[in-house]
């Protein structure tokens, strides 16, 4: 019997959200309410305002609960670090789903906050490894790595600012997957509202039965979502070794993995060629490993599924 990897057994709909952005409570330029209004007015359904959780900002979680309404919700969270920023191989995470009174870590163990966040039920995303020049060779020794649920493979602020070559974290995602870590994929704006194009460029579409912070977190941790710059992943149906993909208009739909294995189920090249909206793949070549669906639309915007373990 076919199973839908995007929706599971849940009856619901997709909700658009961003898990990585900042306000004037840390190093962003707009106040929390202004940030929430900007995302709500741009058609988003939810937001995690992930201000930096550091001593210089008072070790506080920005409380956005008063900004929720019946059509837009917020997830409390913060950007945590594994070590002081100047330390070699420090890394940063969004912890989405923190209590408002989340306390500071011990001075000699910043990573304790990451472990504690996961223990409290937060969805933990490793952020911008490319921006931080975090080497894959250091991954096995990273503190609290077992608390990380997902890796940010696209950081829109980096892509739109002066660091486009640092916006890609796919090397870390694939490296961790090849080492046996079952991590998910993620993307975020990292918006600081410091220039006109640092927002609304990479988000998650989360399949859920209700617009509720706890329900959204459950879906995120279960992998019932995909990241996108615009293309829609509408269906990922697995039946035995066959994977059927339904999308919005696409220039290409492919199935890929780390290393040198990839399959391209549907491609459309050249002027005037009609886009595709579906593809079918054989999962057998990926048995014992993993793969993911990648979509490129006619304007070059991308979407990725979470890893699939056949």
Give the ranges of each region predicted by the language model:
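C-terminal functional module detector
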Residues: 1-14, 32, 179-184, 191-310
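A metal-dependent hydrolase metal-coordination microenvironment
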Residues: 2-129, 133-146, 152-173, 188-195, ...
């Amino acid at each position: 019997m076919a199973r839908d990897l995007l929706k599971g057994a849940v009856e619901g709909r997709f909700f658009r959200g961003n898990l990585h952005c900042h306000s004037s409570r840390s190093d962003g330029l707009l106040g929390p309410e202004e940030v929430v209004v900007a995302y709500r007015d741009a058609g988003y359904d939810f937001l995690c305002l992930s201000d930096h959780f550091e001593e210089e900002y008072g070790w506080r979680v920005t409380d956005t609960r008063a900004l929720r309404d019946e059509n837009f919700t917020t997830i409390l969270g913060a950007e945590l670090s594994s070590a002081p920023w100047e330390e070699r191989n420090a890394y940063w995470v969004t912890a989405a789903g923190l209590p408002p009174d989340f306390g500071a870590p011990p001075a000699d163990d910043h990573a304790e906050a990451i472990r504690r966040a996961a223990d409290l039920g937060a969805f933990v995303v490793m952020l911008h490894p490319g921006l931080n020049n975090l080497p894959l060779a250091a991954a096995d020794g990273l503190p609290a790595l077992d608390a990380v649920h997902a890796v940010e493979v696209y950081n829109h602020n980096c892509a739109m600012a002066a660091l486009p070559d640092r916006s890609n974290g796919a090397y870390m995602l694939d490296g961790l997957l090849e080492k046996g870590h079952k991590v998910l994929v993620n993307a975020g704006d990292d918006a600081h509202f410091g220039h006109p194009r640092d927002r609304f460029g990479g988000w998650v579409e989360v399949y859920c039965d209700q617009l509720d912070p706890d329900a959204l977190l459950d879906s995120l941790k279960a992998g019932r979502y995909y990241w996108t710059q615009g293309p829609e992943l509408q269906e990922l149906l697995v039946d035995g070794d066959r994977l059927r993909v339904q999308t919005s208009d696409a220039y290409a739909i492919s199935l890929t993995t780390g290393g040198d294995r990839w399959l391209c189920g549907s491609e459309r090249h050249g002027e005037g060629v009609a886009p595709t909206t579906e593809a079918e793949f054989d999962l057998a070549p990926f048995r014992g490993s993993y793969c993911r669906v990648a979509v490129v639309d006619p304007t070059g915007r991308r979407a990725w599924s979470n890893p699939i373990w056949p």
